[in-house]
């Protein structure tokens, strides 16, 4: 219980014109109910200047056992090392392998960058302060530490949301994404993600809330303990637009992704096919459910990592900060920072092309993952080429991918699509074009080599002009531009004899790169 004279002494301190309490000292007072800590703050004479007060008790300690500091310090060190090594491996592998540098994978690289910076700026500082059982880096260091944790944490959350929205559009609305998958557009989205994170991380520097010590006073965060309208308003808006709204968007996107996959699976089940065809469709559905499970794990880990920290802040927001102990503030902060080690495992190590790239560029890690780059490369190339051949021959929407296929891990990696996404997007495109998913004859034995398209390279794709080709009916696609000076609607020839231009009929312009075109033999 606090000393009865505590409020009167604190009032005398704040009323003295020579004493100006800093946000850090206010945060210490508001963030702890420990008698010894508040006694250190109240022991300052009313006539002491602000500079002398800061030098006397800049960051007092919490009366907890030493092993509590050492345990948290060890955990945060292990989390930081794992996050740094894991995310650095992701960044290195994606940068070394050209086939992985696709617009879709740029989101994963951005996620790895933000998580890497989170681990670098948080773990060493937290660990050092835990060893000495007090904050070592002063008020400026406290503000910088908390700012880095905020901006990199928010960036990771919003990047996860951008990934979910990107997969949602690609799978459920493939025609709407025509012409929108460029690296430049993705870079603009990522720039918006970082600006959004900065917009919510900078206000404490300008008086809207503050960055103060928290928990065991060996780390810092924004002030969520002070029960004032200004601080409560910032806390409420921060959680609404940084935690709850992104979480709702992620859940919404993956619900519709699951529904698209399920509808595609039902369309396959309704077809009277041979046992070989049914077995392949069943394997495809198993792959789809595997992706669904990975998405579910992403959402659960996202919630589990940040829910404890959010709960603590919301308890203080509701006015019950007096029931919070130092442990209840520090432990959730460590759990939230541990989210930096989840994303490399989920989004990268489970990515088949990434696993092969690790085996190629980091053979030692490839052995640990049980992947051989030399053995996996041909099979992936064959599978990707095989699927491109099937789709370009049998459908009015040919999912064309990639540049320099011999140098990449396969056409699939160029676009950044998984088998599941291709299948679900295929089904959605068939429904949009008014055709049955089952009407496409995709059996290997039913495809003749003489009818397969031949890949030819050209600097600028040749696309049929509106004067000689009819627009494709039922698609409604209006791509604004195409590389090369080609613009216009999605078009298709009614017959090769009616169009003098050599080109592949019936393809979405969005998936045609600047150096690869398909031409008829």
UniProtKB/Swiss-Prot annotation:
Q: In which tissues is it expressed?
A: Expressed in the retinal pigment epithelium and ganglion cell layer (at protein level). Also expressed in amacrine cell layers of the retina. Weakly expressed in vibrissae, and tail.
Which ranges sit in the Extracellular compartment?
1-71, 128-143, 209-237, 315-329
Major place of localization?
membrane
Residues on the membrane's Cytoplasmic side span 93-106, 165-187, 259-293, 351-521
| Annotated SMART domains | 7TM_GPCR_Srsx (SM01381)
Cite the record's Polar residues compositional bias ranges.
449-458
Q: What is this protein called?
A: Melanopsin
Q: Which UniProt keywords apply?
A: Biological rhythms, Cell membrane, Cell projection, Chromophore, Disulfide bond, G-protein coupled receptor, Glycoprotein, Membrane, Photoreceptor protein, Receptor, Retinal protein, Sensory transduction, Transducer, Transmembrane, Transmembrane helix
GO BP terms: namely: detection of temperature stimulus involved in thermoception; entrainment of circadian clock by photoperiod; G protein-coupled opsin signaling pathway; hyaloid vascular plexus regression; optokinetic behavior; phototransduction; positive regulation of circadian sleep/wake cycle, sleep; regulation of circadian rhythm
Query: Per UniProt, what is the name of the gene that codes for the protein in this document?
Result: Opn4
Location comes to: Cell membrane; Cell projection, Axon; Cell projection, Dendrite; Perikaryon
What lineage does UniProt assign to this protein's organism?
Eukaryota, Metazoa, Chordata, Craniata, Vertebrata
């Amino acid at each position: 219980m606090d000393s009865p004279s505590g409020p009167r002494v604190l009032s005398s301190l704040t009323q003295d014109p020579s004493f100006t309490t800093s946000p850090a000292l206010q945060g210490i007072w508001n963030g702890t109910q420990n008698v010894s800590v508040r006694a250190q703050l109240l022991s300052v004479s009313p006539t002491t200047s602000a500079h002398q007060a800061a030098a006397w008790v800049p960051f007092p300690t919490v009366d907890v056992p030493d092993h509590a500091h050492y345990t948290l310090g060890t955990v945060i060190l292990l989390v930081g090392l794992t996050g740094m090594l894991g995310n650095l491996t992701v960044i290195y592998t994606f940068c070394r392998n050209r086939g992985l540098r696709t617009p879709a994978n740029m989101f994963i690289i951005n996620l790895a960058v933000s998580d890497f910076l989170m681990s670098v700026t948080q773990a060493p500082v937290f660990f050092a302060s835990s060893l000495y059982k007090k904050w070592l880096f002063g008020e400026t260091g406290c503000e910088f530490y908390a700012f880095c944790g905020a901006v990199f944490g928010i960036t990771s959350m919003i990047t996860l949301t951008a990934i979910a929205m990107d997969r949602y559009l690609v799978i459920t609305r493939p025609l709407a994404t025509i012409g929108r998958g460029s690296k430049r557009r993705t870079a603009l989205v990522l720039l918006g993600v970082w600006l959004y994170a900065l917009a919510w991380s900078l206000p404490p520097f300008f008086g809207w809330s503050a960055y103060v010590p928290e928990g065991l006073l060996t780390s810092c965060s924004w002030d969520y303990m002070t029960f004032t309208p200004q601080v409560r308003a910032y806390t409420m808006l921060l959680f609404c637009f940084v935690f709850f709204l992104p979480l709702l968007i992620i859940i919404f996107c993956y619900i519709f992704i699951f529904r698209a996959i399920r509808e595609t699976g039902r369309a396959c089940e309704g077809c009277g096919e041979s046992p070989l065809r049914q077995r392949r469709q069943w394997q495809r559905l198993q792959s789809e459910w595997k992706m669904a499970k990975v998405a579910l794990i992403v959402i659960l880990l996202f919630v589990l990592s940040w829910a404890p920290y959010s709960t603590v802040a919301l308890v203080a927001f509701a006015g019950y900060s007096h029931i919070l102990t130092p442990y209840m503030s520090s432990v959730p902060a460590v759990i939230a920072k541990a989210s930096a080690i989840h994303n490399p495992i989920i989004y990268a190590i489970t990515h088949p092309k990434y696993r092969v790239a690790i085996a190629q560029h980091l053979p030692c890690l490839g052995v640990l993952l049980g992947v051989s780059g030399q053995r996996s490369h041909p099979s992936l190339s064959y599978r990707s080429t095989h699927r491109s051949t099937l789709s370009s021959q049998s459908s009015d929407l040919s999912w064309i991918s990639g540049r320099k296929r011999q140098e990449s891990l396969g056409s699939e990696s160029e676009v950044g699509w998984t088998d599941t996404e291709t299948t679900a997007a295929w089904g959605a495109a068939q429904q949009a074009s008014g055709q049955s998913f089952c009407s496409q004859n995709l059996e290997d034995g039913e495809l003749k080599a003489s009818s397969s398209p031949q890949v030819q390279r050209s600097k600028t794709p040749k696309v049929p002009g509106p004067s000689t080709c009819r627009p494709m009916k039922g698609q409604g696609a209006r791509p604004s531009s195409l590389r090369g000076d080609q613009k216009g609607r999605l078009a298709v020839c009614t017959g090769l004899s009616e169009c003098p231009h050599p080109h592949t009929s019936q393809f979405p312009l969005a998936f045609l790169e600047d150096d690869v075109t398909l031409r008829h033999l």
